[in-house]
Regions:
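Catalytic cores of alpha/beta
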Residues: 22, 74-82, 120-132, 177-195
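Glycine-rich, proline-tolerant flexible connector loops at the mouths of alpha/beta enzymes
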Residues: 32-50, 92, 140-148, 201-203
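Hydrophobic faces of well-ordered beta-strands that scaffold small-molecule active sites
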Residues: 4-9, 33-35, 56, 64-68, ...
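A short alpha/beta connector and helix-capping loop motif
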Residues: 41-73, 77, 184-201
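Conserved, mostly hydrophobic/aromatic
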Residues: 18, 25, 36, 80, ...
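A structural motif
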Residues: 27-32, 85, 132, 192
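Conserved anion-binding
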Residues: 14-17, 59, 75-79, 85-172
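C-terminal helical cap(s) of enzyme catalytic domains, especially alpha/beta-barrels
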Residues: 105, 188, 202-219
């Protein structure tokens, strides 16, 4: 089993000082930096674009785990790759050809991820699993931080864990939404090996970040 990677979501950071926040979570032990990109069209919120990702890049050497909640998504893949994304994760619903989107991400030399909304079945992975480096399971409906974990997603995580193990490939299984010490434990038990945490990481300000990350890692 891989050690669990913690990917703090900067959606919960102080947007007025994002560079400082990224340096603080890096120092606190974050494995990846999770960047939630929302367009107000695919999801009901607007967050950040490639320019901010690029501005944050000099602040850390940790991998940028960029989750694109935008539609159409293909037009922006190059921009996020150039801005410094390491993993680019896309929704099957965000364009007509998820296979093509994943192919393009790989052609840019980036890790390709696919993300499943709460109602999107694990079966969606049947014909694309061999292309992906990461599967992200949304345990809340995407758009906002601070939501409650949707328990039905544990069954989906377990099903995807079986699919990944059967594939024999090294694919990360990440979970995003409502992650705290309690739900982190459930997600890990179901088979997750990477956790996105916004509220649970950034609660209490910079002095608490290391303890917050440690609590999730030890869940």
């Amino acid at each position: 089993l891989k050690p669990v990677r913690i990917a703090p979501s900067i959606l919960s950071a102080d947007f007025a000082k994002l560079g400082e926040e990224v340096r603080a979570i890096d120092a606190a032990g974050a494995d990846w930096i999770h960047i939630d990109v929302m367009d107000g069209h695919f999801v009901p919120n607007i967050t950040i674009g490639p320019a901010i990702v690029k501005a944050l890049r000099p602040h850390t050497t940790k991998p940028f785990d960029v989750h694109l909640m935008i539609s159409p998504v293909d037009a922006y893949l190059d921009a996020f790759a150039e801005a410094g994304a390491d993993t680019i994760t896309v929704h099957p619903e965000a364009g007509p050809h998820i296979h093509r989107s994943l192919q393009h991400i790989k052609s840019l030399g980036k890790r390709a991820g696919v993300v499943l909304n709460p109602a999107t079945p694990a079966k969606m992975l049947d014909y694309i699993l061999e292309m992906v480096d990461l599967v992200l399971v949304m345990s809340v409906n995407p758009g906002f931080g601070g939501q409650s974990f949707i328990d039905s997603q544990l069954r989906k995580i377990a099903a995807i864990r079986k699919m990944i193990d059967a594939s024999g490939r090294d694919i990360d299984l990440e979970v995003d939404g409502g992650i705290d010490a309690r739900t982190a434990k459930l997600a890990i038990e179901a088979g997750a090996d990477a956790l996105v945490a916004g509220t649970a990481t950034f609660r209490g300000g910079p002095d608490a970040y290391a303890d917050n990350i440690r609590a999730l890692r030890g869940a």
